[in-house]
A protein has these predicted regions:
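Residue signature of alpha-solenoid helical repeat architecture, marking inter-repeat boundaries
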Residues: 29, 62, 100, 139-140
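Amphipathic alpha-helical segments of tetratricopeptide repeats
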Residues: 30-31, 59-60, 89-93, 128-137
Length: 140
């Protein structure tokens, strides 16, 4: 990590749970990557409305399925589970043919179904997530 790279520094701070410092570091940073990281920091501070607005704006600007994914994640964190599930379904339609991206989406859907108390649906999505993860080249 280059010390002058604010996004890399922000992710290092987030790993330590230093979200307010991340926010201070990234305020005013214009790049989409900086705003993705800022949204994450906001969400983990419980500032869901701000994070949602940021990620929805990023989706309008970039069309990135990552932004849609983050909207779903923040909705889930805010306890808006049915809305989160609908967003993850929308994201699934936008995904590239990439096993890791599909695995991540399937995991989110499985986890959200679990939070909704639907264990059978959850298990099906989590098993599909594992299958996709095993097909990816990601070592995790």
């Amino acid at each position: 990590m280059r010390p002058e790279d604010p996004v890399a520094r922000a992710w290092a701070l987030m790993e330590e749970g230093r979200f307010k410092e991340v926010e201070a570091l990234l305020q005013g940073e214009p790049s989409p990557e900086a705003r993705f990281a800022l949204g994450y920091a906001l969400a983990f501070q419980g500032r869901h409305a701000e994070a949602l607005a940021l990620y929805r704006g990023l989706y309008e600007e970039t069309g990135s399925h990552r932004a849609v994914h983050q909207v779903g994640m923040v909705l889930r964190m805010a306890g808006r589970l049915e809305e989160a599930l609908a967003v993850f379904e929308e994201e699934a339609r936008l995904l590239p043919p990439d096993p890791l991206a599909r695995s991540t989406n399937l995991y989110e859907r499985g986890y959200t179904w679990l939070l909704l108390g639907e264990e059978e649906a959850s298990l099906a999505f989590l098993q599909a997530s594992l299958t996709e993860a095993e097909a990816s080249s990601d070592p995790l």
